Design a protein with these regions (language model features):
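Phosphate/NTP-binding elements of NTP-utilizing enzymes
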Residues: 1-135, 149
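Detector for the mature cores of small, proteolytically processed
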Residues: 125-168
Length: 168
């Protein structure tokens, strides 16, 4: 179901980490070059209304969040459980279209964090699949070659290493 013409979008930031929600609100304000008109920050709430009328709200991934409705979901893959994503987000993001209105972020992925291990990667991919279904285009962006599609997987059991290859 799409938003009615003229209705401003409402973004829900699904994360257990309020500081990360605050960071995401500030990042979206900067990236969209839209100043914040009203801001509420407290222990249990983080909310912003931009000058253009767009709203951003921190939504804790708990059963009590199910009454909130939004048009776009920003989902923290590190703190939202697979069950919450599968059972509640499609009903909370009532006006969202899976191909356009979901943003996946990972609050555990910082410059100081360790690289993903296999269990973490599987966890993140299962959560994405719960919303998008099967994603057929898997790859990465390379500064030299641009978009590179993953085409082959090799496993070195002795070194406990998995390698993804491309056509290049």
């Amino acid at each position: 179901m799409a938003l009615l013409k003229g209705v401003k979008p409402q973004y829900a930031i699904f994360t257990a980490d309020r500081e990360f929600a605050d960071y995401e609100i500030d990042a979206y304000a900067r990236s969209h070059n839209c100043p914040i008109a009203k801001r509420v920050k407290s222990t249990n709430d983080s909310f912003a209304i931009m000058k253009d009328g767009t709203k951003y709200k921190w939504v804790k991934p708990t059963d009590s969040s199910r009454g909130y409705k939004c048009s776009t979901g920003i989902i923290d893959l590190a703190t939202c459980s697979l069950e919450f994503i599968r059972e509640w987000i499609p009903y909370i993001c009532l006006y969202a279209e899976p191909e356009k209105n979901y943003v996946f972020v990972d609050s555990s992925n910082t410059k100081d964090s360790k690289p993903y291990d296999l269990h973490t990667l599987i966890d993140r991919l299962q959560k994405i699949e719960a919303i998008l279904g099967n994603v057929e285009k898997l790859g990465f962006s390379d500064m030299e070659y641009g978009w590179q599609r993953l085409t082959y997987l090799s496993v070195n059991a002795k070194e406990k290493e998995i390698t993804f290859d491309t056509d290049c």
